[in-house]
Amino acid sequence: MDKRVFGVETEFGCLVADENLGNPEQIVEEIKDHLFYDKKIGLIDHHARDDVFEPAESGGFLLNGARLYVDAVGSHLEYATAECQSLKDLVANDRAGQRLIVQALHDLGLAEDCAIYNNSVDHFGGHTFGCHENYLVRAEGELMNGTLHLLIPFLVTRQVYAGVGRVGGHVLFEGDAPTYEQLSQNPIDYIWVSHVYGVAPDPSVKFQLSQRADHILRTIASKVRFNRAIVNPKWETMYSQNGMTRLHLLFGEANQNEYGYALKIGTTALAIRACESGLISHDFLLAQPLVALRDISRDDSFQWLLELQDGSIVSALDLQSRYLEACQAFKGESDQNDWILTEWERTLNDLKADPMQMGDRLDWVAKKLICEEYMASEQIGWEDDALQSVDLEYHNIDPAASLFYGWQEMGRSKRLLRDLDIMVAQADAPKDTRAHGRSKLVEHVLKRKGAPIYTFDWSSVQVDRQRFTQLPEPLDPYANPLDQWGQPIFGDK
């Protein structure tokens, strides 16, 4: 596919310093209710999308084309971006969601004692928070029917520029089967971490590239609730009624740096296309993908060596260069493709020269530098627990409190966006995907007097049980979605 949409789902953690304000589960409900009922940034679902995981009024679609909800598994906030074709639109839409959440904290007077984080691991409890990527692919195409495994080496090695960095590590071990009493009295994520497998700190690891590498158990898995994998194929047609589906990538992390975020999504989109186009050789395949995943993340020598299926030893940078070379076939097709290819090559060259000079572009480098500066000022070592707090505060999404945004304010982080871009994206959906049409329908229902009955989904909208609009094509902006209903709309003017 020469054109595709992509989107990112991010799960957020919440910390509450003042227990008198309530627990984190109560705080995220307050944030959600404030945004939908008071600020009216979207339409809250009055139906259950899932009786267990997304009951009625757990969230809904927003004016900017995205979706915000409280995931019942862990009771955490989750934000799914609008469908995007442009990397700039994607990063802006993602950051817009964060700004809306932060503004709610301030509106509610909670910002001093509550914080929201896009970190991907809990250092102490062993829980992880997902940052999942979605890419439009053909359900009957080459990727989903024979070449998906050729994408795995790319995903394993892209952490050299896509990783967000992590202080310390975890060791997993087999857990005991939970009792019926524990199943009934505890949330699913507690059962998952405490019983499906056990988690313990690994004191041998000072710092690593990835927050989630220690927790990945499979390369490809169709069922992922208790089976963390790199890729979830999503054998479904929810993205389109014309033979399209979504590729759901589970091994990823929430990038703070705009450049690193865009590079991760852009290179992955091109690598997917290369696999679809038959440009990737079986010579790229890894001998042990999960071993390589952890070894690369934990290699503090930055050699990042791994073994291929043919027995040869190559570096992660060399393997990334092979994917880059294959993707040069798409050079000249668009400004976006050319940016991706140019920056991909520049990043690999700079990583070969000196990774620690890339703190302006890569999250793991910036975080490591911040930790080292803190250690020098406090005269402590990597074993000090204070560094786990530094790690966490890097991912505070409030620009007024985040270590990352402090880094950015000092001019030490490369930006792709203006603050104005993020502000606009809080209310406006991307104009070249179906998110545009869906947002127009959200806007229309919000303006309507009374209390209409409605059901919104990614690809369809129903209002008053009589008006139904389909939005099957992700690449169609549906400039006039109300026309499908005829006149008058909803029976009012």
Where are these regions (language model features)?
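Terminal catalytic/cofactor-binding subdomain
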Residues: 1-118, 127, 149-162, 201, ...
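Internal, well-ordered domain-core segments that constitute the primary functional module
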Residues: 106, 112-219
